[in-house]
């Protein structure tokens, strides 16, 4: 199954996760595409995985615009959505806030791949936000910090994405 993996990565974690996903799916059948390098072409692919970082509860603007603009094309192929971030307790909120119900209904899979903290890569408001969250993370379970990628989530996502749907 020929798969296009579209991602947006701010600190490198989503890019790393996209590469791990490709390895799980069989890299020879996958093409990685950074949304920041232009507009991807979906024709010629059997399925598509779209991934983004979550920053302050919001997915990347280019990924969001791509999903909206290419919704009909995505709904006509098998696709999945993955998110990367460090606030594990806020993932459900981010999914509801950023992904419309019809995307969740049509997606073969939606998964959280975890995240990695790279405080040295943040600047300004983001750096202050990260420091604030780190201070309260031990006190509020909703602000549970994740500083690792979940290989089991990537493996599960790959299995679900590559599984034959009942209609196939």
Predicted regions and their residues:
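N-terminal beta1-alpha1 ligand-phosphate binding loop
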Residues: 2-27
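The conserved SAM/SAH-binding core of class I Rossmann-like methyltransferase domains
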Residues: 6, 33, 82
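FMN-binding flavodoxin-like domain, especially the glycine-rich phosphate-binding loop
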Residues: 24, 28, 56-168
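A short, well-structured beta->alpha microelement
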Residues: 28-40
């Amino acid at each position: 199954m020929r798969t296009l993996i579209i991602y947006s990565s701010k600190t490198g974690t989503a890019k790393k996760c996209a590469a791990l996903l490709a390895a799980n799916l069989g890299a020879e059948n996958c093409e990685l595409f950074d949304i920041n390098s232009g507009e991807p072409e979906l024709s010629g692919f059997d399925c598509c995985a779209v991934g983004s970082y979550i920053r302050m509860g919001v997915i990347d603007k280019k990924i969001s615009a791509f999903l909206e603009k290419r919704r009909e094309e995505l709904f006509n192929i098998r696709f999945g959505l993955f998110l990367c971030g460090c606030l594990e307790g806020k993932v459900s909120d981010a999914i509801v806030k950023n992904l419309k119900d019809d995307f969740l209904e049509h997606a073969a899979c939606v998964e959280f791949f975890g995240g990695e903290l790279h405080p040295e890569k943040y600047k300004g408001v983001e750096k202050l936000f990260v420091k604030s969250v780190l201070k309260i993370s031990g006190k509020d379970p909703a602000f549970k910090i994740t500083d690792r990628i979940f290989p089991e989530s990537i493996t599960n996502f790959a299995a679900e994405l590559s599984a034959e749907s009942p209609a196939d």
